[in-house]
Amino acid sequence: MKKKWYIVLTMSGYEEKVKENIEKKVEATGIKNLVGRIVIPEEVVLDATSPSERLILSPKAKLHVNNGKDVNKGDLIAEEPPIYARRSGVIVDVKNVRKIVVETIDRKYTKTYYIPESAGIEPGLRVGTKVKQGLPLSKNEEYICELDGKIVEIERMKKVVVQTPDGEQDVYYIPLDVFDRDRIKKGKEVKQGEMLAEARKFFAKVSGRVEVVDYSTRKEIRIYKTKRRKLFPGYVFVEMIMNDEAYNFVRSVPYVMGFVSSGGQPVPVKDREMRPILRLAGLEEYEEKKKPVKVELGFKVGDMVKIISGPFEDFAGVIKEIDPERQELKVNVTIFGRETPVVLHVSEVEKIE
């Protein structure tokens, strides 16, 4: 006889304990022929409304992560290319500077300032500080903010000036963590193409989900902390052959309150409803369609949509929330008689006219 899936009811918060208790009891009694796999459906959700980590990179930076992928703390996520001398010459100046990047509120434009440490940085300037046009950035007021926005990056760097034989000057800004004082010295001659600084590597400071944004003047990597959330609190899905022995076996497990039943009889879960549960648990494969770079949002709250890819493929639901920036929709789908919110990319749904 083929096993079917049933829903075991428990108190919310005791799902893992019930799963553990059933597995231990199956192992101890050896009735694997009656009780099989056990699944607690979970989804990964963002744990915060703002990025846990934000990295601003040059357009030439090489990315080692993709949009929507999960990373662990310490993973290599990006690297800036090495810095090479554009022309031959002599290093005539090496100074400490502070790099300050100001971004407009709409995130469309940025302005970068390199302020000599000798000029003094205005007190109170830090990442996240809102600034207005005309605000002094240095104590000597030689460096003035030219746009309204907020500071998104502050970093100590070295300004290296190389004077060419014809009297012109090439300026390089080298981050302190790749600055080599043996390589960069005042009075040292450098050849065209000579490496002034090695590639700068960036490692994830936190674990989470990656969002990559590609602007014309820069690249950004944002890492959002994530957490796992029970999709159906109080439900544990058990694959079993339903007979008196199996019923009493599961029913006697601590914290089990019963089965989802009709007329006093446990009701097996329909294959169509079980399919997304198995996909989320990694027990059934499905084709994950690639998301386009940009999709025009043609949806509004209240629209009825059909899910066309992912674990909930072929289910229909109603749009409850729209996130235009991430091109994501929160859709309520009805499964097992419950309305369950799922977050989907706009490319994973189509509107039902």
Curated annotation (Swiss-Prot):
<dbReference type="GO" id="GO:0006353">
    <property type="term" value="P:DNA-templated transcription termination"/>
</dbReference>
<dbReference type="GO" id="GO:0140673">
    <property type="term" value="P:transcription elongation-coupled chromatin remodeling"/>
</dbReference>
<feature type="domain" description="KOW">
    <location>
        <begin position="301"/>
        <end position="335"/>
    </location>
</feature>
<dbReference type="InterPro" id="IPR040473">
    <property type="entry name" value="NusG_add"/>
</dbReference>
<dbReference type="InterPro" id="IPR006645">
    <property type="entry name" value="NGN-like_dom"/>
</dbReference>
<dbReference type="InterPro" id="IPR008991">
    <property type="entry name" value="Translation_prot_SH3-like_sf"/>
</dbReference>
<dbReference type="InterPro" id="IPR001062">
    <property type="entry name" value="Transcrpt_antiterm_NusG"/>
</dbReference>
<dbReference type="InterPro" id="IPR036735">
    <property type="entry name" value="NGN_dom_sf"/>
</dbReference>
<dbReference type="InterPro" id="IPR015869">
    <property type="entry name" value="Transcrpt_antiterm_NusG_bac_CS"/>
</dbReference>
<dbReference type="Pfam" id="PF00467">
    <property type="entry name" value="KOW"/>
</dbReference>
<dbReference type="InterPro" id="IPR043425">
    <property type="entry name" value="NusG-like"/>
</dbReference>
<dbReference type="InterPro" id="IPR014722">
    <property type="entry name" value="Rib_uL2_dom2"/>
</dbReference>
<dbReference type="GO" id="GO:0032784">
    <property type="term" value="P:regulation of DNA-templated transcription elongation"/>
</dbReference>
<keyword id="KW-0805">Transcription regulation</keyword>
<dbReference type="InterPro" id="IPR005824">
    <property type="entry name" value="KOW"/>
</dbReference>
<keyword id="KW-0806">Transcription termination</keyword>
<dbReference type="GO" id="GO:0031564">
    <property type="term" value="P:transcription antitermination"/>
</dbReference>
<keyword id="KW-0889">Transcription antitermination</keyword>
<protein>
    <recommendedName>
        <fullName>Transcription termination/antitermination protein NusG</fullName>
    </recommendedName>
</protein>
<dbReference type="Pfam" id="PF02357">
    <property type="entry name" value="NusG"/>
</dbReference>
<comment type="similarity">
    <text>Belongs to the NusG family.</text>
</comment>
<dbReference type="GO" id="GO:0005829">
    <property type="term" value="C:cytosol"/>
</dbReference>
<keyword id="KW-0804">Transcription</keyword>
<dbReference type="Pfam" id="PF18298">
    <property type="entry name" value="NusG_add"/>
</dbReference>
<comment type="function">
    <text>Participates in transcription elongation, termination and antitermination.</text>
</comment>
